[in-house]
Structure formats: C-alpha cells, structure tokens
Swiss-Prot record:
GO terms for molecular function: GTP binding; GTPase activity; metal ion binding. NCBIfam families: mnmE_trmE_thdF (TIGR00450), PRK05291.1-3 (NF003661), small_GTP (TIGR00231). Keywords: Cytoplasm, GTP-binding, Hydrolase, Magnesium, Metal-binding, Nucleotide-binding, Potassium, tRNA processing. GTP binds at residues 222-227, 241-247, 266-269. Binds 1 potassium ion per subunit. Homodimer. Heterotetramer of two MnmE and two MnmG subunits. The gene is mnmE. It comes from Caulobacter vibrioides (strain NA1000 / CB15N) (Caulobacter crescentus). InterPro entries: G_TrmE (IPR031168), GTP-bd (IPR006073), GTP-bd_TrmE_N (IPR018948), GTPase_MnmE (IPR004520), MnmE_dom2 (IPR027368), MnmE_helical (IPR025867), P-loop_NTPase (IPR027417), Small_GTP-bd (IPR005225). Belongs to the TRAFAC class TrmE-Era-EngA-EngB-Septin-like GTPase superfamily. TrmE GTPase family. Its EC number is 3.6.-.-. It comes from the Bacteria. This is tRNA modification GTPase MnmE. Exhibits a very high intrinsic GTPase hydrolysis rate. Involved in the addition of a carboxymethylaminomethyl (cmnm) group at the wobble position (U34) of certain tRNAs, forming tRNA-cmnm(5)s(2)U34.
Length: 446
C-alpha cells in the first residue's frame, strides 16, 4: 500500500498562516482523527484540531477526493496559525497517527505517477517556485500549463505518422502500394527537422531566462567598474578606493532589469602583475568574462586615450563604456567612440561619478536584455536534459532523412528512436534514476 505522507507546504518560520499538506490513502482517516467530522470535499471548513484529547489549534480544513487533487490521491490541507509550536505539534500528531514525512518533491512525483502532469510540467512547477522575475514566472507558468509538452507531443505525432508510411513500405513490399509511399514521409520529416533546429537554437534563451543573463564589467584597474556596479545595484556591493587593484575576486550581484534576472559581475582590473593573489583575480576575471552573455569594457574617461589600443580579447557585440565623461576630454572621447563603433561595439558615454550615469546604463542594459531574451509565446526549453533529448531526436531525424529512398528499414528505425527521445522529455519512458534527479530538486512540501 502507498504510504500516506505529510509536509509543511509553506515556508518554515513565524508567519500568519502555515499550510500542512497530507496525501495518500489514509488522509481522510487521519484528518478525521484530528478534527472529528470531516468537511465535504473541496469545501473549506473551520475545525478544532485535537490529538490525544489536547487541542492543537483552530484550523481551516480542506479535503480533496481522488483523482480531483494535486497528487491524484485523497488529500487534506490544514491551514493553521504559523507559529513554530503550532506547526511542530501538528506535524508530530500526523506522524503518531501513521503518516510519514514526505521526501523532497514527493507530492509532485505522485502527481506525475498518477498522470496529473508529465515530467516537463513537473520541472515547470519547480521553476515556478524558484521564479524571481516576471519573465521567469511567465516561462515557468507556460511550462506548467503544458505548452512545452504539447509541442513535444505534436512532434511525436508527426514522427508516428511518418513511421506508419515507412513501415507500410517495409511490411507490404509486394502489395499494390504507390511506389512513392516512403517518399511521402520526407516533407514532414524535413519540416520537423527545421523546427527542432529552431528549438535547439532557442535553448540558450530559455536557460538565460531561468538562470540569469550574465554581464561582466571588465577593464583596467581604477576604470570605475566597482563604482558602476554599486550604482547599478543601488548599494555598496563592492569596495571602492583610489588604490589600483582593490578588486581581487569576481563580485556577482543579481539584479532585475526589464523583468529579467541579470547577474552583473565586477572583476579584477586586467593588467600584468607579479602579485600572486591579484594574478589569480585577473585569471578569474577573464574566465567569467569569456562565459558572459554581454561584456562591458569600462574605460576611464580621464585616460580615454587608453582605449585606442584594441584589447586582444575584445569581440563584436561587446560594449565600450566611456566612464567619467563628465571629467573627460570631449574631443578624445568622441574620437574613441567613433573608432570603436566602427569595430562593431556599442559605445556608451557614462558619467559614472554622478547618479545619472548608472541610471542611464541600467536603462540601456534593460533594453538590451529584453531584446535578447524576449521570444515566442511558448516557453523555451530551459534544462540541459531537454536540450540533450532534442539534439538526440534531431540526429536520428537527419539520419532518417538520408536513409529514405535508400534503406527504408533503417529510416523507420531512426524515426522510431527520434520519437522515443521526445517521449523521454515528458517522462513516458524515463528510467527511475532520471526521475529521482528531477524530483530531488524540489522542496519537501511540494
């Protein structure tokens, strides 16, 4: 028999209300032991919870009968006062009555096992809980609603249709079938291959929405990188002094720009140094910048002629920030800006020593991030697991396209394998260890 499980579904600690969730075959029995007469299903009712004759709390009780519950099982929710003592007393009573504390993600795993949602939707639930920005909320909510799953299912259906044509050509070679029956599968497979390519190209966008768009502030020591970071963060996140080389490590600050999560990093000033610690900071700065989605080369406007020498690591798409332009040589700044704009860099003039400077940079970055991450209405794949299976399906599909007309049996097998790769995203045929990894990332009460 399946265990009856329980957990605190709201955040631990002092609060006005705490929600304790119970799910499993003995949910109603255990709830009745605590509150006596059970409320009707899906009707919230106030009950006094008692255990061993001792009152625990006055609670709002909700009961759900299977399959009309989150988990697909009989379930009960207790909405109690959020004091630690009240919650601990209720959890202890549930344990004594025969329920056990749920494992991480166990409620959602039961929902998956009972067909209430598929694996991609379950991952969307985890992302929705972790969402910090409006973009992350929209992305995760679309995934929970089944937008990704519906797309994958449509692709699988197209593969099944193509497979039927290919297998007809294999299984009935002597029947009066049109000679081109196998070739009829080719246009649909080509279209699907193009859609898979587009989805894989969009994976990086989805992952940046979920994990954050990475922006690196790089440049020579004392260019004003730390001052700009503090201005963007609107707090003293980095130490600012007149001493060159103050920043020795990468300082990451999470921000929300234009509704998207952004990680801005202040890095050690790039220069040759005999100082072992500073040299390690420079190495880390270069590594972080190499992996960044956008790199801002900050140049001290007071020494703007330094920007005449092209840094070796600079690349098209980088930004050149002419900082401290309120004290810079205007003619020299204009010359440098014109030169670097011609090299494919975006050039911004920032008065980093005033309040307007960081604000102007923040607005420019918000616009850039929104342009980079805004996409189609459906959510993009955000997880490496999805990208791997999509890439696998594309490989099988490309091989099938090369086999159609030559080795129909091989083409049919490749189409079958492509369909199975898509099925693994939704969890239809995933092994137990994959399921365990997915649900282990959840909180206990979900």
């Amino acid at each position: 028999m399946t265990d009856t499980i329980f957990a605190l579904a709201t955040a631990a600690g002092r609060s006005a209300v705490a929600v304790v969730r119970v799910s499993g075959p003995r949910s109603s029995e255990i709830a009745a032991a605590l509150c006596g007469r059970l409320p009707s299903p899906r009707l919230a009712s106030v009950r006094t919870l008692k255990h061993n004759g001792v009152a625990l709390d006055a609670a709002l009780v909700l009961r759900f009968e299977k399959p009309a519950s989150y988990t697909g099982e009989d379930s009960v929710e207790f909405h109690v006062h959020g004091g630690r003592a009240v919650v601990e007393a209720l959890l202890a009573a549930l344990s004594e009555l025969g329920a056990r504390l749920a494992e991480a993600g166990e409620f959602t795993r039961r929902a998956f096992e009972n067909g209430k949602l598929d694996l991609a939707q379950a991952e969307g639930v985890a992302d929705l809980i972790d969402a910090e920005t409006e973009a992350q909320r929209r992305q995760a909510l679309g995934q929970v609603g089944g937008a990704l799953s519906q797309r994958y299912d449509r692709w699988r259906d197209l593969l099944v249709q193509a497979l039927a044509m290919l297998e007809a050509a294999v299984d009935f070679p002597d029947e009066d079938l049109p000679e081109e029956v196998a070739e009829r599968a080719r246009p649909g497979l080509r279209q699907l291959s193009a859609e898979l390519n587009a989805a894989l190209a969009d994976v990086s966008r989805g992952r940046r929405v979920r994990d954050g768009f990475r922006i690196a502030l790089i440049g020579a020591p004392n260019a004003g990188k730390s001052t700009l970071l503090n201005g963007l963060a609107e707090r003293d996140a980095a130490i600012v002094t007149d001493v060159a080389g103050t920043t020795r490590d990468v300082i990451e600050v999470p921000l929300v720009l234009g509704g998207y999560k952004v990680l801005v990093a202040d890095t050690a000033g790039i220069r040759e140094t005999a100082d072992v610690i500073e040299a390690e900071g420079v190495r880390r700065a270069k590594a972080w910048a190499e992996a960044a989605d956008l790199r801002l080369w900050v140049v001290d406007g007071f020494h703007v002629k330094q920007a005449d020498a092209r840094p070796e690591a600079i690349r098209v798409g980088d930004w050149l920030i002419l900082n401290k332009t309120d004290i810079a040589d205007a003619d020299a700044s204009a010359h440098v800006a014109e030169r670097w704009a011609g090299e494919g860099l975006t050039v911004l003039h920032i008065a980093g020593t005033s309040a307007e400077g960081p604000e102007a940079l923040r607005a420019a970055l918000a616009s850039h991030v929104a342009d980079a991450l805004s996409g189609a209405e459906f959510p993009a794949a955000t997880r490496l697991r999805h990208a791997e299976r999509l890439s696998e399906a594309r490989s099988y599909l490309e091989r099938a396209l090369s086999d159609v007309g030559l080795e129909v049996e091989l083409a049919a097998e490749d189409v079958r394998l492509a369909a199975r790769a898509l099925e693994r995203i939704s969890g239809r045929i995933d092994p137990e260890d994959v399921l365990g990894r997915v649900f282990s990332t959840f909180c206990i009460g979900k």
